[in-house]
Amino acid sequence: MNSVKFSLTFVLLMACLQGVNSAEFLPSFVVTTAQELSALITGQTAQGTFADGTAVQSKYGADGTLTASAPSFSDAGRWRVEDGRICGSLRKLGEFCNDARLDSGSLYLRRKNGEIVRYEVK
């Protein structure tokens, strides 16, 4: 009986912890305007970690340039913002638009594969 309770508790805990990597934003996440997004990321670096453990970094230049990097990978291009989205084009990866939300000072972006990634902007 105790092992069943432990197993159920563990499964529920893991489901809660994995919620950020699901395809839906949490209800507390705030949709941002283009102006808010621009103010947050212009001239800044956003660092995050994909669900598979890959550390990623994006540098949003004040001139609209974008540099994206991960271990053994780098790409460059341009970025722009729309209400609730960061969009752009990278030389290797091509065009993209990621839904963007804010929560507790962190930036959350939904990748093309649906994964939601938490970024710290510095």
List the predicted regions and their residue ranges.
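Lipid interaction determinants
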Residues: N2, L8, L17-K122
